[in-house]
Amino acid sequence: MKMNPCTVILCKSLFFFCLFQVDCYCNRKNIQNQSSRIATKIKRSYWFRWQKHIILANIHKIIKAYQRSIIKLPVTKGL
């Protein structure tokens, strides 16, 4: 079965917008792997450390939203 590519987009903070666009395949396992990789990347970044909890909360919201509509996922270019 062919998978459709999708884009995971994160996150909105209080003072600025930042977008993490990650191409992935739209199945549950790959989306979860992508969220782990993004979270790891953010944890290593000094710039995002103070708002890590905000970003991780948004990751979980977005992953859940994608999992609920696993079949028809639009490719999104921005917020």
UniProtKB/Swiss-Prot annotation:
Keywords: Glycoprotein, Secreted, Signal. It comes from the Eukaryota. It is found in: Secreted. Glycans are attached at residue 33. One of its GO terms (cellular component) is extracellular region. Residues 1-24 form the signal peptide. This is Uncharacterized protein YBL008W-A. It comes from Saccharomyces cerevisiae (strain ATCC 204508 / S288c).
